[in-house]
Amino acid sequence: KAVFDAYWGKWAEYRSSVGLVLSSHLQTQVALAKARHYENVLERELFQDNLPPAVYRTLVTEVNKALPTLHRYFKLRQRMLGLDQMHYYDIYPPLVALDKKFDIETTKAITLDAMEVLGDDWVKIQRDSFDERWMHVFPQQGKRSGAYMSGFAYDVHPYLLLNHNDDYESLSTFAHEWGHAIHTLYARQSQPFETANYATFIAEIPSTSLELILQNYMVNQAETIDEKLFYLGFGLEQMRGTFFRQTMFAEFELALYEAVERGEALSGDRITQMYGEIVRRYHGHDEGVVIVDDLYTNEWMFVPHFYFNMYVFQYATSVTAGTALYGKILEDQEAGSANYKDLLRAGGSDYPHLLLSRAGVDLTQPEPYQAVVTQMNAIMDQMERLLEERDQ
């Protein structure tokens, strides 16, 4: 609480200035969309990849319908942390501590074992790639933080930047970035230069799929109840942060553009009010699920993606598609993995929505989003059973 109050309290001092900057950006984008004869900014931003607006709007609609599942997660979190009342700052502490280290060699071995569900050819490509020294693995002075895969050169293999810290998050990040890398390899091997590069809308799907495969593997390999709870809780938190939080941002961003398109003038105070209404609805503030104090409604100022024009929704659609494709692998490992790899090999050979539809995932329809919600509820059912077993 002290950290949140100090951090967002300082941001609040700049609300008027940051509001002016964001409002100016929004007005510019609306003017550019009108000048180019688009109906609105959403239509303009989806045009390049020929994405139906129904993808964006169905995502927002289905996630709003699923808010009771998000609230169930918060109540489970409250129970596991032993809190009388959840506040916004209680979302981030880990549910269970894991005293386990994953050095880089262990990380490689676990990843190869977990990815056996994708077939021998996948494992061979990944194992051979490990031996080619494509990765800069460890943190060092002057190195940027985070993790990144670079695969821009058609005739050159991908490079991976990592900052491995021997923890489970580093292991999950390792799998994530190799999802990008092998996607790039498959696309380069199967497509000519002109159609090898894939759209952002597709890019995060392989990475999120590999995280799901890893998580399921780790749960099955866990030796204690607390270890299982850690992996399940880690996966739930990723779903919250990607499926719900990014959709919340997407809904907020759409509301901002629609307000400007109606001719409304947006100040820092008005933007904060709009964000506050959405963040409180998502977190069940009025129902007492998670209390979001006024100060924390300044959070919108912290998010750089609001200057990227309708970008964040793709994180949520990616985890949705990744969950659907992984579900097909679980149903029929051979056919599901072949279908998955066919999508990766397709690169940018067609519009991303059409490629996904051919892989059996139609994101204009409610079913893929509902499958994510079903998966979250199944994880929480499993966690509640484990908690009862542990507490006996």
Please place each PLM-identified region on the residue numbering:
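Contiguous, non-catalytic segments that form substrate-binding/exosite surfaces or channel walls
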Residues: 1-159, 387
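Amphipathic alpha-helix face/heptad-repeat signature
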Residues: 3, 7-10, 59-62, 66, ...
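Secondary-structure capping and boundary motifs in well-ordered enzyme cores
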Residues: 34, 52-55, 103, 140, ...
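Active-site recognition of the HExxH zinc-binding catalytic motif
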Residues: 37, 165-186, 207, 212, ...
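Active-site-adjacent bridging/hinge elements
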Residues: 38-43, 85-87, 146-157, 177-189, ...
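C-terminal, non-catalytic "cap/extension" segments appended to globular domains
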Residues: 50, 79-89, 174, 209-212, ...
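Conserved catalytic alpha/beta cores of large enzymes that bind or transform nucleotide phosphates
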Residues: 70, 74, 78, 199-215, ...
